[in-house]
Amino acid sequence: MKRLLAVPAVLTLALSLAACGDDEPSTGSDGADGVACTYNETGDAAREVDLPPGEATATDKVEVVITTTNGDLRATLNGDTTPCTVNSFLSLAEQGFYDDTPCPRITTTPGFEVLQCGDPSGTTAGGPGYQYEDELSGGETYPAGTLAMANSGPDTQGSQFFIVYGDTQLRPDYTVFGTVDEADLSVIEEIAQDGDDGTNPAGGGAPNTPIGLVSITTD
């Protein structure tokens, strides 16, 4: 399962994904119009989708609206610095992978404040049936508003992501692929005030006030 683990001084986010496989990847070629990306099939999709294109063409900033059951979150995706992550995220959004899915976990400890979404199974263990490499600089930080990918270890990104609604200390192991408008974080802050059920052994649990994704669309 994907999980957030607290360690002294620094928090490490290990958001688990289902077991991976080693099937045929989707790849592209570097070119003037895009960036080559490789997506490796794992055969364990929580909801069936096609692999993303093997070439990322969204290589600039992309505006999206993350519509939740509790309000809209306007976000800017970093296609310029994390093109393969943004390519996957947009592909999943366009295929309806995220539509009508729960956000199964929230953490409310000061310094560790995130909402985890992107698993149609609602277990924090599901994914899209493929994984791909991290896009890290080594200098990642996770202030409020950060939009980042969950993982279960190096290069295991899939569909699950987390939104940081309060400044959070994590090791720089999680691809930061966008930011959520500060004004919209109140949607999550209100949910956080009601706490969680404490069922996740690594911290946090299901929000006591449920929240889920309705859709993700380009703005």
What are the residue ranges of the model-derived segments?
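Cyclophilin-like peptidyl-prolyl cis-trans isomerases
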Residues: 2-219
